Amino acid sequence: MIVDNSKDFDLKSFLANLTTHSGVYRMLDKHGEIIYVGKAKNLKNRINSYFSKGAKDSKTLMMVEQIARIEITITPSDYEAYLLENNLIKQHRPKYNILFKDDKSYPYLVISRDKFPRVSFYRGKSAYKKGQCFGPYVSISSVKNTLNTIQKIFPIRQCENSYYKSRVRPCLQYQIKRCLAPCVGLVSQQQYDEQLAILKKFLAGKFSSVLEEISAKMYQASEDMEYEKAQVYRDQLVVLRKLQQQQIVDIQEDKTFDVIGIYMQDSYASIALLQIQNGDVVADRHWSIDAKGQDKTSIMHAFLSHFYLGDEIRNIWPKNIILSKVEFADITDLMNSISQKIGQAINWIIAPAADNLKWLKLAEVNARQKLNIYTSSKSQYQKRLESLKEFLESEKDIKRIECFDISHFQGEATIASCVVYTDDGEDRKSHRRYNIKDIKSGDDYAAIHQAVSRRVSSGLEADNLPDVMIIDGGKGQIHQAEAVFREYGIQDKVQLVSLGKGVERISGKEKIYKGFDDTEYTLDEHNPGFLLLRQVRDSAHDHAIKGQRKKVSANRQSSIIEEIEGVGPKRRKALMMYFGGWQELSRASVDEIAKVKGISKKLAQEIWECFH
């Protein structure tokens, strides 16, 4: 239940009437933004402590000064409170909470929700939306190797739905016994589901159970004189047993565990997580954060909640977790909540010895090294920001920079890229591209005008305009952006600057133009602010090129056949229905192409020559 939802907030009355139940509280500022999320066993005691006369660190004092309203949610148990707290922190990213940015999105194997499901892989936490997930895997290569192994053992389809729906005959995968061809009805729903169920057990790590089940099915099929079916099971067993023999390490040895090391220096902290399976380091992940006013225990508490109570899907959980030394009593409840979520007991090792101590020291060495790199990079970036601020004569700190670049192929497939840098560095998740429409071929000025106009329009609506907008180009390009700024009346809200290569077109010799200022500026090529301008510009250029190449590739594939005389919409559709896609068509022989209804041998030869 939300206790307060009004604009007029009486803090004194609120504190006096607080419940003593467990739950989650949210601190909001005068703008209605959540600035802190916390969890408490006793909401009344915890929230009142912020306003008591006891000693508090500077960060807490600063936060309390900004509190305009407090909201609470009562939860039935500590476990639910931890989950809600973690979800709210990830959703709102309050500025006074300890925040972790995952180093990268890990790949998952996904079994889709189709009638005849496919197995594939996706990156990131959104994978669960595609179907049932297994993972995460350490790298793309490891997940691809697993997919390849699966295809040798379990004949479950891996093709895209568009390809699957267009089939009128079995593909090569069926011929080499790596797919049951549900696309053309060569397998019953029951048979397919049976293979799928065994595959799921295999991916869940139930190796012995899979061997027993397939063996039993093989003998049963043999007794029922279904010899072809028995042979399929026998072939599966052969591959599985070879795979089993390759596992040199005894899986019964308890060697699956996580090691979490923390290193703190000044106002920063770094967490290194080593994931150990069967005695080998299979993953090294790390997080570096601003930890001003925090101690090691509070950082560990926040990390454990973020990593183990988050929404990352995993099928294998560590039996042991080794931690840097923290106050055990302060995280006991959280440990219990993690075990409750997993559904199994975890052995928490906070005072490791012998080999466990060696693992912890290794994690802490990794954390220290990562923090040194992080602080060095952050310091250099802050110097560049300050230098740019000085050059632009800005009165306020630069919190957000956006840069636009245009890319096209011979005047066509025009793309505008927009990359984002914050005071923490590049924000890849906020990068975007604009498909430019309804302009003359190769008109970069019109493209810049359209892209900037669309961004400013949406930025005013969402109230998220940047502090600085960079345009890749010279006077002509910046004049287009100036026109947009005048149209929307934001000349005083966003600082505009462009970077042109000039006559020499040499990196480091670019000409700089400020918005609404006809002066041509130059800076020393080693000037920190100039280096930042070029860094952001280069990032925008790369982002634009990648998007434009994708667009050209898509356009080319669909236009290759259109160039052949005699191949109209009906024949193109027939070709796609028969082969399922451009890739399969490009691999087909002349004789195979000629089998398509309406395609003569001569026309098949012309189509084949288009791809070779």
From Swiss-Prot:
Sample GO molecular function, one term: DNA binding
Coiled-coil region(s): none
Gene3D superfamilies listed in its UniProt record: 5' to 3' exonuclease, C-terminal subdomain, GIY-YIG endonuclease, UVR domain, UvrC, RNAse H endonuclease domain
Top-rank taxon: Bacteria
InterPro entries, sorted: GIY-YIG_endonuc (IPR000305), GIY-YIG_endonuc_sf (IPR035901), GIY-YIG_UvrC_Cho (IPR047296), RuvA_2-like (IPR010994), UVR_dom (IPR001943), UVR_dom_sf (IPR036876), UvrABC_protein_C (IPR050066), UvrC (IPR004791)
Any one of the GO CC terms: cytoplasm
Primary subcellular site in the record, as a coarse category: cytoplasm
UniProt subcellular location: Cytoplasm
Example of a GO biological process term: nucleotide-excision repair
Record keywords, A-Z: Cytoplasm, DNA damage, DNA excision, DNA repair, Excision nuclease, SOS response
The keyword DNA damage belongs to this UniProt entry's keyword annotation: yes
Domain GIY-YIG: 20-98
Pfam family, any one: UvrC_RNaseH_dom
Domain UVR: 208-243
Keyword Cytoplasm among record annotations: yes
SMART domains: GIYc (SM00465)
Family the UniProt entry places it in: Belongs to the UvrC family.
PANTHER family: UVRABC SYSTEM PROTEIN C, UVRC/OXIDOREDUCTASE
UniProt subunit comment: Interacts with UvrB in an incision complex.
Known role: The UvrABC repair system catalyzes the recognition and processing of DNA lesions. UvrC both incises the 5' and 3' sides of the lesion. The N-terminal half is responsible for the 3' incision and the C-terminal half is responsible for the 5' incision.
Protein name, as recorded: UvrABC system protein C
Lineage: Bacteria, Pseudomonadati, Pseudomonadota, Gammaproteobacteria, Thiotrichales
Gene: uvrC
